[in-house]
Design a protein with these regions (language model features):
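Helix-start (N-cap) detector for alpha-helical repeat units in TPR-like alpha-solenoids
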Residues: 2-3, 36-37, 69-70
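Alpha-helical linker/edge segments of TPR/alpha-solenoid repeat scaffolds
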Residues: 14, 79-92
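Short coil turns that delineate tetratricopeptide repeat
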Residues: 33, 66-67
């Protein structure tokens, strides 16, 4: 199988719902482990399913590859939401 030609583009994968996209991204990342955009998209898909740990791990991995990745903004967003929730738990 010619993986590059038989595989949907990241743009197409990004349009799919999370449950369809994540397995495709998992396979894509086997062949392209340093693709920060794929990691960011997978992180966003995980976030949409409330898989917070997996999302943050993907964002951090993307940032190791490319410190200017859009994962930077996604991670800041995730941290701000988690900080908000933690404050509510401490100060009901």
């Amino acid at each position: 199988m010619n993986f590059q030609n038989d595989f949907p583009s990241l743009e197409d994968i990004n349009k799919l719902d999370a449950l369809e996209a994540i397995p495709l991204l998992d396979n894509y990342l086997i062949y392209n482990p340093n693709d920060d955009e794929a990691l960011t998209i997978r992180g966003l898909k995980h976030w949409s399913l409330n898989h917070r740990k997996e999302a943050i791990n993907d964002y951090l991995q993307a940032l190791k590859i490319n410190p200017e990745s859009r994962a930077k903004m996604a991670l800041q967003f995730a941290n701000s939401i988690l900080d908000y929730y933690n404050k509510d738990l401490l100060n009901p």
